[in-house]
Amino acid sequence: MSSARFDGDTWDLASSVGLTATMVAAARAVAARDPEGAGAVATDRFAEPLVRAVGVDFFTRMATGELDAAELDEETAIGMRHFGAAMAIRTRFFDDFFLDATASGIRQAVILASGLDSRAYRLPWPAGTTLFEVDQPKVIDFKIATLSELGAQPTADRRAVAVDLREDWPAALRQAGFDPTERTAWIAEGLLGYLPAEAQDRLLDQIAAQSAAGSRFATEGLPDVNDVKQEELRRRMQRQNERWNRHGFDLDMAALVYFDDRTDAGTYLAAQGWQVTSASNSELFTQHGLQPLNGDDAPFGEVLYLSAVKDTAAAA
């Protein structure tokens, strides 16, 4: 299957790759409506109003609860709940990553491809923390305007860096006040699969080049990437599309992802001297008191969540 992506393609939050950020925010809103389950793991009070502001009917109805179980066939209703739970687990992992990083004294953070991420507004950042959000200009501008209309105030010194990650984003980051001599906490949430293999390696190299010793990085992806895993992910995404197509959502999500041979991020970073730890989504479900999603219940199969620390030798 070829990708629908091309060199220089751009998007907003209602099209192409940008729509995946709206999809994830809608899933966070679904989780929030389950306070005894997924909503107890992670809650994003800004998810629903942000999705509503984007204006994609299917995701608006999903986020607001208008697309409820009575309207859905059983398979789609269950799949939607599972998707919300999976995104709650993912959200909590990256929330905890930042909280742990700042507890260690880190006061500089970067969110790459920030989309509709609201951590700048909802996490309890320590005084003196600077948080950089990097994404395409249309995405950055929309989120700033929408959250301003909602009366939301950042809980950190939030700095928007409106630049495509295929451009010289490190220069734009430094221009916004980023200090590469300070320890940094980086996240690339839901990003790497939308990059070709060589672009993924380049991104990791760029992060490493700007990371002082003791900096931290977190991301997620498929374990042991190979043709079988890629085909499994493609099949799962196609099944998700078929469910949602019945309710007016018409976008081939699999066509946005690059299914090419690549070194997984954990292996790549470990080879460069980073200390890498990992946890599977099944382990995280159990840790947070949720029933793990097995087999076809898991929207994207088994996902591995990675956290890495750059040691002194890697920084030398």
UniProtKB/Swiss-Prot annotation:
GO terms for biological process: methylation. The keyword Transferase applies. It is an enzyme of class 2 (transferase). The keyword Transferase applies. Coiled coil: none annotated. S-adenosyl-L-methionine binds at D135, D164, L165. Keywords: Methyltransferase, S-adenosyl-L-methionine, Transferase. Disulfide bonds: none annotated. Its EC number is 2.1.1.-. Belongs to the UPF0677 family. This is Putative S-adenosyl-L-methionine-dependent methyltransferase MMAR_1069. It comes from Mycobacterium marinum (strain ATCC BAA-535 / M).
